[in-house]
Amino acid sequence: MEAKPVAIWLFLCSLMVICMVGIGGFTRLSKAGLSITEWKPITGTLPPLSEQDWLKEKSKYEATPEYKAFNYGMSMEEFRTIYLIEYVHRLIARLTGLVFILPFIYFTLKKRIPKNAVIRLSTALLFGILQAFAGWYMVKSGLVSNPHVSHYKLALHLLLALVIFALLSYQFFDYQIKPKQIIKINSNITCYIWIILILVTVQIIFGAFVAGLNAGLIYNTFPLMDGQIVPEDLFYLQPAWLNIFENRVTVQFIHRALALLILVLTAILTIKNASIKPLYVMLFSVIIQVILGIVTLLLHIPMAIAIAHQMFSFILFGSGLYCLRYLRNQI
């Protein structure tokens, strides 16, 4: 079957994007993201190969505010560890790009991809290029006087990854779902799924805010926030709207509230349309994601569960896209 290699390639690319999200989370939680102070897309492919190279890289890091504030006196062995974590992060990002670009060129030249898919995948390529620049833009924000990556730029980096994943996975579903699997449905269902996907996107952005502001380190109780449904200090910043984006308490409160809203809406949609089996996959994904979020909070952000929570948000989004593709043009 001619479409099968293309479908396998799209699945692999989608999977690699999810893996990159996990690696990015591991890099952030390991506090290794600022260890490489330069961005060299081509020459940066190789790590330091000699002791002199390592000393040179360490001296560059020692000039950064992060080193002076948090890692002063760090040994060479400790530096190698965080450097290699960030190096692997960047290397796999390059590898992901190659795994996408080379087969894309081949399949396009061989006319194995329909024209509408070429446009969609070219858009994914464009966003991939933007993602590379956004990654460096994010790192650069932490190399200034305040050694802390901007949570806005962290959210942008994650959002671009989500767009790339959405384009790739939706195209993959195009190859996987056959007409015989599709049923007649009410037009309102797709509208409801779109609403849920928009809420999931906003939730992922607020997840990035929670991570960037270390908001997961406060109010480590559930369902109440230290005994309160609505915690104090929700609006202590002025102007009031700033709390939505920069107040750790408000950001965590919104993240919790959105999770419950998405769960309730997905449950209602599934119950009302019990004959549509893909909705159960989306509901199950929401339940797993909520559980991962609660456990991450209660256990004070254990690395493995926190990374799983971040990665699974993309799987949840993908389950919603699958539902959309399953129901498309069946009105």
UniProtKB/Swiss-Prot annotation:
Keyword Chloroplast carried by entry: no
Keyword Glycoprotein recorded: no
Molecular functions per Gene Ontology: metal ion binding; oxidoreductase activity, acting on NAD(P)H, heme protein as acceptor
Single GO cellular component term: plasma membrane
Enzyme Commission identifier(s): 1.17.99.9
GO biological process: heme A biosynthetic process
Top enzyme category: oxidoreductase
Catalytic activity: Fe(II)-heme o + 2 A + H2O = Fe(II)-heme a + 2 AH2
Ranges annotated as spanning the membrane: 6-26, 87-107, 124-144, 154-174, 193-213, 251-271, 279-299, 301-321
Membrane topology according to the record: Multi-pass membrane protein
Cell location: Cell membrane
Pfam family name, one: COX15-CtaA
Residues binding heme: H255, H309
Subunit structure, as described in the record: Interacts with CtaB.
Its biological purpose: Catalyzes the conversion of heme O to heme A by two successive hydroxylations of the methyl group at C8. The first hydroxylation forms heme I, the second hydroxylation results in an unstable dihydroxymethyl group, which spontaneously dehydrates, resulting in the formyl group of heme A.
Protein name in the entry: Heme A synthase
Originating organism: Wolbachia pipientis subsp. Culex pipiens (strain wPip)
Lineage, highest ranks first: Bacteria, Pseudomonadati, Pseudomonadota, Alphaproteobacteria, Rickettsiales
Gene: ctaA
